[in-house]
């Protein structure tokens, strides 16, 4: 599997709760849609940014694990900043206007036990806020940090987001999934690049 964010293999299914097609994003995935597809993901310490151009009613979501990579891995942007650039660039390619893009951000819970100093969830939350501020993209809603994992559904056509905080019973499962993806990414070769659009 490619270590860079991807839109391939995004699982789509009929969501019974919302009676619509949903696309479930896993860590390292992102997707942009211009229809009624619900974008959904489950977050622990990871962060998902939901971006939207309200005029075109197009939006997208990413799911990243870390704000940045190790300085020595040759690709510090393959995590948070890479995820954000890919999502923004894909929206711009589809006609979104940078000055109209707005953000809703979620996740960054501190679910990994034993990480009390500079926890990854807090770092992810700080990163996404600072990144969007630097890009002049307003955050119009957020649910970041805390101790509970979350499941979110984002409806790009309306901008609606539904957040379900998961009980403590799910923490171990979410933390194990995130840890496994981190381990896989740390061993994967660095590939790909980012093309910036203004």
UniProtKB/Swiss-Prot annotation:
Reactions this protein catalyses: L-glutaminyl-[protein] + H2O = L-glutamyl-[protein] + NH4(+)
GO BP terms, alphabetized: chemotaxis
Family annotation (Pfam families): CheD (PF03975)
This protein's UniProt keywords: Chemotaxis, Hydrolase
Gene3D superfamilies per the UniProt record, alphabetical: 3.30.1330.200
InterPro entries in the cross-refs: CheD-like_sf, Chemorcpt_Glu_NH3ase_CheD, Cytotoxic_necrot_fac-like_cat
Example of a GO MF term: protein-glutamine glutaminase activity
CDD domains: CheD
EC number: 3.5.1.44
Main function: Probably deamidates glutamine residues to glutamate on methyl-accepting chemotaxis receptors (MCPs), playing an important role in chemotaxis.
Family: Belongs to the CheD family.
UniProt protein name: Probable chemoreceptor glutamine deamidase CheD
Gene of this entry: cheD
């Amino acid at each position: 599997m490619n270590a860079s964010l991807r839109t391939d293999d995004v699982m789509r299914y009929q969501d019974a709760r919302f009676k619509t097609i949903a696309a479930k994003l896993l860590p390292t995935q992102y997707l942009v849609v211009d229809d009624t597809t619900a974008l959904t993901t489950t977050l622990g310490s990871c962060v998902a940014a939901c971006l939207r151009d309200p005029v075109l009613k197009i939006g997208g979501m990413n799911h990243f694990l870390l704000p940045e990579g190790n300085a020595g891995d040759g690709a510090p942007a393959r995590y948070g900043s890479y995820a954000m650039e890919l999502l923004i660039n894909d929206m711009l390619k589809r006609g979104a206007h940078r000055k109209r893009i707005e953000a809703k951000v979620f996740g960054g819970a501190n679910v990994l036990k034993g990480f009390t100093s500079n926890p990854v969830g807090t770092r992810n939350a700080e990163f996404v806020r600072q990144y969007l501020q630097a890009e002049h993209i307003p955050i119009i809603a957020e649910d970041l940090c805390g101790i509970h994992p979350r499941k979110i559904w984002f409806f790009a056509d309306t901008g609606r987001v539904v957040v379900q905080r998961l009980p403590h019973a799910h923490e171990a499962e979410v933390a194990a999934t995130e840890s496994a993806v981190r381990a896989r990414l740390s061993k994967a070769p660095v590939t790909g690049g980012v093309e910036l659009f203004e």
